[in-house]
């Protein structure tokens, strides 16, 4: 089975399958790509703490795939998979999306009040906001370094891993600050007449964990 596939958006899937049983550990693995409509594929939704099923569990029962669906050379799928994951890690870190979230956070903190003062005027919350702005800027420049290296044909290496981890952590911290800035209303999620932004901040807080 394959856990956490986005079948909601995908009609193709790739799999790493062992095609040479006697080959060494990372050898004898082939990289296949084929349709999600292939007979024998079953998709089961995985409901998360958000209450939604953004990811799915995919099961394969006697699935048969034509040999021409192999990507690259037979038995060399491990190298193809590493290249795929390298690009995926770089794509998962999106500083522009985080900057948009920060702008929305600033607007929220200017509107929400803690006691008689705006949330953005609270020194502790403001310090957290400034720290997040600095972290997102650093992540953006790290992304530029990765792009520059890629254009020169150099591998991203550990820098891509840093971007992926940093992106997830910063997204969660931004949502956490928004919830704290809302005060007691920050615990409200869906189906509440007083929820803010449709419960998006709470949803993101749980999704980015």
Summary of predicted features, one role per range:
Residues 4-44:
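A short core secondary-structure module
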Residues 4-7, 49-50, 209:
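Glycine-rich phosphate/pyrophosphate-binding beta-alpha loops
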Residues 2-3, 195-209:
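Short, intrinsically disordered, charge-balanced linker/junction segments flanking boundaries
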Residues 114, 123, 137-196:
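C-terminal helix-coil-helix/basic helical segment that borders enzyme active sites and/or dimer interfaces
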Residues 29, 55, 75, 160-162, ...:
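Active-site lining segments that contact anionic ligands and/or coordinate catalytic metals
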Residues 18-22, 35, 39, 61, ...:
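Short, well-ordered loop/turn and helix-capping segments at boundaries between secondary-structure elements
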Residues 41-141, 207:
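Glycine-rich beta->alpha junctions and the first turn(s) of the following alpha-helix
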């Amino acid at each position: 089975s394959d856990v956490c596939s986005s079948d909601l958006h995908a009609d193709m899937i790739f799999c790493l399958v062992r095609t040479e049983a006697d080959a060494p550990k990372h050898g004898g693995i082939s990289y296949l790509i084929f349709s999600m409509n292939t007979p024998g594929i079953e998709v089961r939704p995985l409901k998360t703490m958000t209450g939604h099923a953004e990811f799915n569990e995919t099961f394969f029962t006697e699935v048969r795939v034509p040999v021409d669906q192999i990507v690259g050379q037979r038995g060399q799928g491990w190298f193809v998979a590493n290249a795929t994951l390298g690009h995926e890690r770089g794509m998962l870190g999106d500083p522009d999306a985080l900057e948009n979230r920060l702008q929305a956070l600033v607007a929220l903190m200017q509107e929400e009040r803690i006691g008689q003062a705006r949330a953005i005027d609270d020194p502790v919350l403001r310090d957290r906001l400034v720290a997040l702005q600095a972290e997102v800027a650093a992540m953006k420049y790290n992304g530029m370094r990765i792009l520059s290296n890629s254009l020169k044909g150099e591998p991203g290496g550990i820098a891509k891993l840093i971007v992926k981890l940093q992106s997830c952590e910063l997204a969660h911290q931004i949502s956490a600050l928004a919830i704290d800035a809302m005060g007691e209303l920050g615990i409200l999620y869906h189906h509440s007449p007083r929820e803010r932004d449709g419960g998006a901040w709470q949803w993101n807080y749980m999704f980015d964990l």
